[in-house]
C-alpha cells in the first residue's frame, strides 16, 4: 500500500509481483511457469552450479529480475520497487533511496487476515513463511542480513506512524536525496567535460570543479 502510494505521488511505475510479467515478456517466458519461483530461496538439493552457471530456476529468475532492474535504472527511468534485493542491486547508483518498512506483529497479522481472507492460524503461517523466504533470498543474493538498518537509508515503523505519515516521510526524503544525487551526477559530468574541454576563467586560469 505504501509503495503504491509513493509511486502514485511521483507518477512512476510500481514493480512488485508484476515484475514477473515484465521479465516473462522480455524473455518470452510463460508467466505461469515462473511465478512460483519469485523471491524464492534456491533449493540446493535439486540444483547445482557448474562453471558459474546455475540450473536453479530460482537463481535464473533472480538474475533476470536483477538485470531488468539495472537496465531500467541505467536508462534513467524512475520507479518504485518492492523487494528483489533492489537496494543491493542499485547500491552503486547515486539517485536511489531505499527503505525498510516494519510493522508490529499484531498489525501484520490483522492486515494479512483481512487482505487474504485467512484465519489467524493460516495468516500467522503465511507471515512466518514469507519473512523466512525473504530473509533467505536476501542473504543468498547479497550476503547481508535482511532488515538490518545499515543496509537502507531509513527504517520506518508504519504501525506507529500510519500509512499516510510513513508515505509523507518517504516522499520528503526521496525529494531531498534525489536532488542531492542529481547535483552529484551533474558535478561528475561537468568534471569530465572540463577535463575533455579545458576552459579558462576571466583571469586566464584553468577552470576546475570544486
Model-predicted regions and their roles:
Residues 1-6:
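Glycine-rich phosphate-binding P-loop
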Residues 9-15:
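Post-Walker A helix-loop "phosphate-sensing" segment adjacent to the P-loop in P-loop NTPases
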Residues 18-78:
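ATP-dependent small-molecule kinase phosphotransfer cores
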Residues 40-47, 119-164, 190-194:
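Small-molecule kinase domains that catalyze NTP-dependent phosphoryl transfer to phosphate-bearing small molecules
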Residues 70, 143-209:
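NTP-dependent small-molecule kinase module
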Residues 72-79, 83-93, 97, 111:
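RNA pseudouridine synthases
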Residues 86-87, 102-108, 160-162:
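Conserved nucleotide-binding/hydrolysis micro-motifs of P-loop NTPases
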Residues 92-114, 120-130:
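Conserved phosphate-donor/acceptor-positioning beta-strand/loop module used by diverse small-molecule
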